[in-house]
Swiss-Prot record:
This is Alanine--tRNA ligase. It comes from Erythrobacter litoralis (strain HTCC2594). Binds 1 zinc ion per subunit. It comes from the Bacteria. Consists of three domains; the N-terminal catalytic domain, the editing domain and the C-terminal C-Ala domain. The editing domain removes incorrectly charged amino acids, while the C-Ala domain, along with tRNA(Ala), serves as a bridge to cooperatively bring together the editing and aminoacylation centers thus stimulating deacylation of misacylated tRNAs.
Length: 887
C-alpha cells in the first residue's frame, strides 16, 4: 500500500518526468488577492498567470497546494467530522499548462497516471464532459477506450469553469471512481448522484474561451490546462478504503487523539476524533503560514476552527489542553513534505495551548448555559437567536459551534434571530472581512500592469536615474498630463525609488527635466507587488505621458531608512539567540525616524533580556562587517540557512542578505531573504537603542527602537533631563537616584508629621484645656465644631471618639476639606442619643455641602459633599438644628 506521502511524491515525479516544473505550495494566505481569505484551490497561485497579468513560471507546471475551506463562499466547516470527504484543510494535486499542451495530452496524462502508473482498475473509472464538448468526448473514447455509457455529458455549471463574469473560461472533464455497489449512489447526472458510491477524484479544466458579462465572446489565443486532484480522495482509492479518514495520515492522527484521550474512535465519539484530526491540520498549517487567532478576518476563522476542535476534545473528556500535544504526530506525518511545519512547531504548540487554556475558562460555563436553554427541547425544536448570540458575545461561542453542539440532538438555531442580535450590538467582536485597502482602486493598476508590465527597480545600485512616464493617475483614473499644483501618481518604466513593501516605507525625493519641470515625490507605493507608484505634487511645468524625467531619491532619508531596516535584521537574530528559535518575525515598520519589530514570543521581555539584545546588536554594529547580497533560488537560500518570512511569496530568484560576523561554522550573524534596501556595512547603523517593548496581541511582542543620529539625540535628551534634575536637586547626575530616594523618604516622614499635627490640632493642639475652650453651649448641650483642611477623612471617626471621651456629654462635628471637597461627620454621646441623632445632624450639614444623604448610627454618622467652601456653613446648619431642638 502506498502511503499518502508516497502518492504525493509519485504524482509530482510523474509530471516532472513529463517535463513539468515542480512549484512549491504557496502559503495559505493569498498573495495580493483581497478577494480570497485563504488559498482554496490549486490554481489560485496561478490566477494572474491565467489572466495574463504575470509571466508563467514555466510552460508546464505541477504542484501539491495546501488549501483551506473554512470561511466565505467555500466553507466546509459545518460538515467536517460527519462525512467521509469534507475537510477544512486538504491538498490539491495539480498539473498546469500555460499555452503548451491542451485537451488530448491532459486526458492522456490523467489516464496514464491513474491506470498505468498507479494501477487503478480502469473498469471503475467514469468520465464526465460538458454536454457540447465533443472534442473531449472523442479523446476519452480514443485514449481511454471508455464505453459511451461511462462518458457522461453534463449540461450544468459543474462541468463548466469560469473565474468570473469576465475573463477566461472553459469546459471541464471530471473523473469519478466507483467504490462499489455496496455503497448507495449513482453515477454523475443520475438521480442518485449525491450518494457516496461515485466519487470525483480529478477535475480537468480546459481554459479555451474568453467571456464578457457572462457571455462567451471568443476563443483564447493561448489555451491553458488547470487540473485538480484531492490528495485525500485519491489516497482513499489507492489504499482501498472508502472514507478519507481511514487513510494512513488520518489514522495516525486519530490514533494519537485516541491515545491522549483514552477514548476509542467508535460510535458517537468517532466524529469528535475526526474533527480533532482535521482541525489539527488546518490550524497548524495556518499558524505556520503566519495566521494567529484574533477577533476578525483570517484570525477569527482560525479561532473558530480551534474552538470547534477544543469543544470536541471536551466531549471526549479531555480536562487539560489537548491540541498542542498532537502537533508532534502531525509533524512526523507531514513535516518532511512541508518543512514550515517543523520550523514553526514551537509556535504552533504554544499558540494552540494558550488558546485552548483561555477558551476552557468559559467553555464549561457556556455549555451549561446551552444545556439550560435547551433542556426541555426535543428533536426538531429551534434555539432562539438571542441565546445563541449571548453564547457568542459572552462565552466566545461562534454561531457554528452552537449549531455543531446541538446537531446530534436535532435542534436547529435561529440564524435570522442571531443575525438581528448581532446587528443591534454595534461593538460586536467579530468584524466582517473586507479585504485589503487596495481593492477599491486596484482596477487601474491591473490595467497599467497588463499594458506596461512591472516597473524596473534600479534602486539597489543607484539613487538617481532617468525614467519614462508610462502612466499618470489622478483620483483613481488615468490622465494624459498634470500641471503645476496637481497632486498625481506618476509611474515610470524604471525607477530608483523603493516602493513601500516588506514593512519598509517608500522613498521620497524629486523629479525634474532640463526645461524647468519640478516634481516633489512624497511617497512611493507598490500596488500588485509589481508597480512603483510615485505620490507626487507638480511644483512647476507640465508632465506629459511619455516624458523622460530625471529621478532623484532623497539620499539622507534613504540612509536613515536602510539603517533602520538593517537593524531589524540584527535585532531578529539577537532575539532568536537570546529567546530561542521559536522567535519569528510577525511584522515590522521601517521608517526614517524609527523602527518597529513584531515577533512571536509568549511573554514580556525582562530588563536583562532587553539589555542583552541591545548590547548584542551594538556589538555587531561596532564590528562594521560588510553587508553582502546574493541572488539565488528560494530553495537554495533556505538550504543555506536564510530565514524566510511566513506568508511571503518569493519568485524564482530571491535576494539573500548576510550581515554581521561569521561563526566558527562560517555562517553570518544574520542571513535573511529580503527585498529591501540596506546599509553597506553594519557600522553605517552607528548606534542602536531600544526605547520600548510591549504586547501587540496574544503571543506577539513588539520592540520599538532608534538608530544612528535619532538614537544619539534621544540619549542626549535623556542626559540633558538628568542634568536638569541633578541641578534642581543640587547634586551630581551620578547621585540623582540616591538623592531622589532620600527626598521621597523625607517626604513620607513629613507627611506623617503633618497628619499627626492635624490630628493634634483637631484635639485642641495645646491639650484638653485648649480643646475645652473651643467648646460652646447651645441650649443645655455642649457642642464642639471644627473645620480642618487637609485631614484624611478616615481619621474623622477616631477624632470624634476622642472628643466624646473628652467632653463626657455633648455633640461634636468635624468637616474635613481636601482639594475642594468635604467629608462631614458628627458624634453624639450616649446620654444624648435619645434626644439627638447623629445621622440627622450629618444630613443637615451634607445638604449645605451639596451632597446627598449620609449614614451611620445614632451616636456616629458620616457623609460628604462637593462644595468644601461651605464647610463653616455646614457646621452652622448643625448649630441651628441644635438650637431649634433646645427652643
Amino acid at each position: 500500500m502506498q502511503s499518502t506521502n508516497d502518492i504525493r511524491r509519485s504524482f509530482l515525479d510523474y509530471f516532472t518526468g513529463a517535463g513539468h516544473a515542480e512549484i512549491a505550495s504557496a502559503p495559505l494566505v493569498p498573495y495580493n488577492d483581497p478577494t480570497l481569505m485563504f488559498v482554496n484551490a490549486g490554481m489560485v497561485p496561478f490566477k494572474n498567470v491565467f489572466t495574463g497579468l504575470e509571466t508563467p513560471p514555466a510552460p508546464t507546471a505541477t504542484s501539491s497546494q495546501k488549501c483551506v475551506r473554512a470561511g466565505g463562499k467555500h466553507n466546509d466547516l459545518d460538515n467536517v467530522g460527519y462525512t467521509a470527504r469534507h475537510h477544512t484543510f486538504f491538498e490539491m494535486l495539480g498539473n498546469f499548462s500555460f499555452g503548451d499542451y491542451f485537451k488530448e495530452q491532459a486526458i492522456e496524462h490523467a489516464w496514464t497516471l491513474l491506470t498505468r502508473e498507479w494501477g487503478i482498475d480502469a473498469a471503475r473509472l467514469t468520465a464526465t464532459v460538458y454536454h457540447t464538448d465533443d472534442e473531449a468526448y472523442d479523446f476519452w473514447r480514443k485514449i481511454a477506450g471508455l464505453p459511451e455509457e461511462r462518458i457522461i455529458r453534463i449540461a450544468t455549471k459543474d462541468n463548466f469553469w469560469a473565474m468570473g463574469d469576465d475573463g477566461p473560461c472553459g469546459p471541464c472533464s471530471e473523473i469519478f471512481f466507483d467504490h462499489g455497489d455496496h455503497i448507495f449512489g449513482g453515477p454523475p447526472g443520475s438521480p442518485e448522484e449525491d450518494g457516496d458510491r461515485f466519487v470525483e477524484v480529478w477535475n480537468l479544466v480546459f481554459m479555451q474561451h474568453e467571456q464578457t458579462g457572462g457571455e462567451i465572446t471568443g476563443d483564447l489565443p493561448n489555451k491553458n490546462i488547470d487540473t485538480g486532484m484531492g490528495l485525500e480522495r485519491i489516497a482513499a482509492v489507492m489504499q482501498g478504503v472508502h472514507d478519507n479518514y481511514d487513510t494512513d495520515t488520518f489514522k495516525e492522527l486519530i490514533g494519537a487523539s485516541e491515545g491522549l484521550t483514552g477514548v476509542k474512535a467508535e460510535g458517537d465519539q468517532a466524529a469528535s476524533h475526526r474533527v480533532i484530526a482535521d482541525h489539527l491540520r488546518s490550524t497548524s498549517f495556518l499558524i505556520a503560514d503566519g495566521v494567529l487567532p484574533s477577533s476578525e478576518g483570517r484570525g477569527y476563522v482560525l479561532r473558530r476552527i480551534m474552538r470547534r476542535a477544543m469543544r470536541h476534545a471536551h466531549l471526549l473528556g479531555a480536562s487539560e489542553p489537548l491540541m498542542h500535544r498532537l502537533v508532534p504526530a502531525l509533524v512526523t506525518e507531514m513535516g518532511q513534505a512541508y518543512p514550515e511545519l517543523t520550523r514553526g512547531q514551537a509556535l504552533i504548540e504554544e499558540t494552540l495551548e494558550r488558546e485552548e487554556a483561555r477558551f476552557r475558562q468559559t467553555l464549561e460555563k457556556g455549555l451549561r448555559l446551552l444545556d439550560d436553554a435547551t433542556g426541555d427541547m426535543s428533536e426538531g425544536d429551534t434555539l432562539d437567536g438571542e441565546t445563541a448570540f449571548k453564547l457568542y458575545d459572552t462565552y466566545g461561542f461562534p454561531y457554528d459551534l452552537t449549531e455543531d453542539a446541538l446537531r446530534p440532538r436535532g435542534i436547529a438555531v435561529d440564524e435570522t434571530g442571531f443575525a438581528s442580535a448581532m446587528q443591534r450590538q454595534k461593538d460586536a467582536a467579530r468584524a466582517a472581512w473586507k479585504g485589503s485597502g487596495q481593492a477599491a482602486d486596484s482596477e487601474v493598476w491591473f490595467d497599467i500592469a497588463e499594458r506596461e508590465g512591472a516597473t524596473e527597480f534600479t534602486g539597489y545600485t543607484s539613487t538617481s536615474g532617468e525614467g519614462r512616464v508610462v502612466a499618470l493617475v489622478k483620483n483613481g483614473k488615468e490622465v494624459d498630463s498634470a500641471s503645476a499644483g496637481d497632486e498625481v501618481v506618476i509611474l515610470t518604466n524604471q525607477t530608483p525609488f523603493y516602493g513601500e513593501s516588506g514593512g519598509q516605507t517608500g522613498d521620497a525625493g524629486t523629479m525634474s527635466t532640463p526645461d524647468g519641470v519640478k516634481v516633489e515625490v512624497t511617497d512611493t507605493g507598490k500596488p500588485l507587488g509589481r508597480l512603483h507608484t510615485h505620490q507626487a505634487k507638480i511644483q512647476s511645468g507640465t508632465v506629459l505621458k511619455g516624458d523622460t524625467l530625471h529621478l532623484d531619491v532623497d539620499v539622507d532619508r534613504r540612509d536613515r531608512v536602510r539603517a533602520n531596516h538593517s537593524a531589524t535584521h540584527l535585532v531578529h537574530a539577537a532575539l532568536r539567540n537570546r529567546l530561542g528559535e521559536h522567535v519569528t518575525q510577525k511584522g515590522s515598520l521601517v521608517a526614517e525616524d524609527r523602527l518597529r519589530f513584531d515577533f512571536s514570543h509568549p511573554k514580556p521581555l525582562s530588563e536583562d533580556d532587553i539589555a542583552a539584545i541591545e548590547a548584542e546588536v551594538n556589538e555587531e554594529i561596532r564590528a562594521n562587517e560588510t553587508v553582502t547580497t546574493r541572488l539565488m533560488s528560494p530553495d537554495d537560500a533556505v538550504d543555506a540557512g536564510a530565514l524566510a518570512l511566513f506568508g511571503e511569496k518569493y519568485g524564482e530568484e530571491v535576494r539573500v542578505l548576510s550581515m554581521g560576523r561569521r561563526s566558527k561554522e562560517g555562517r553570518n550573524y544574520s542571513v535573511e531573504l529580503c527585498g529591501g534596501t540596506h546599509v553597506r556595512a553594519t557600522g553605517d547603523i552607528q548606534l542602536f537603542r531600544i526605547i520600548s517593548e510591549s504586547a501587540v496581541s496574544s503571543g506577539v511582542r513588539r520592540i520599538e527602537a532608534l538608530t544612528g543620529d535619532a538614537a544619539r539625540q534621544w540619549l542626549v535628551r535623556r542626559e540633558e533631563a538628568l542634568k536638569s534634575a541633578a541641578s534642581a536637586l543640587r547634586t551630581n547626575p551620578e547621585e540623582v537616584a540616591e538623592r531622589v530616594a532620600a527626598l521621597l523618604d523625607e517626604r513620607k516622614a513629613l507627611e506623617k508629621e503633618l497628619a499627626d499635627a492635624r490630628k493634634q490640632l483637631a484635639l485642641g493642639g495645646g491639650g484638653s484645656q485648649v480643646a475645652q475652650s473651643q467648646d460652646e453651649t447651645i441650649g443645655d448641650v455642649t457642642f464642639s465644631g471644627q473645620v480642618i483642611n487637609g485631614l484624611n477623612p478616615k481619621d474623622l471617626r477616631g477624632l470624634l471618639d476622642e472628643a466624646k471621651q473628652r467632653m463626657g456629654s455633648g455633640i461634636a462635628a468635624i468637616c474635613a476639606v481636601n482639594e475642594g471637597k468635604a467629608a462631614f461627620a458628627a458624634a453624639v454621646t450616649d446620654d444624648l442619643t435619645d434626644r439627638y441623632n447623629a445621622v440627622d445632624l450629618v444630613r443637615a450639614g451634607v445638604e449645605v455641602l451639596g451632597g446627598k444623604g449620609g449614614g451611620g448610627r445614632p451616636d456616629m454618622a458620616q457623609g460628604g459633599g462637593p462644595d468644601g467652601l461651605k464647610a463653616e456653613a455646614a457646621l452652622n446648619a448643625v448649630r441651628e438644628r441644635l438650637a431649634s431642638a433646645a427652643a
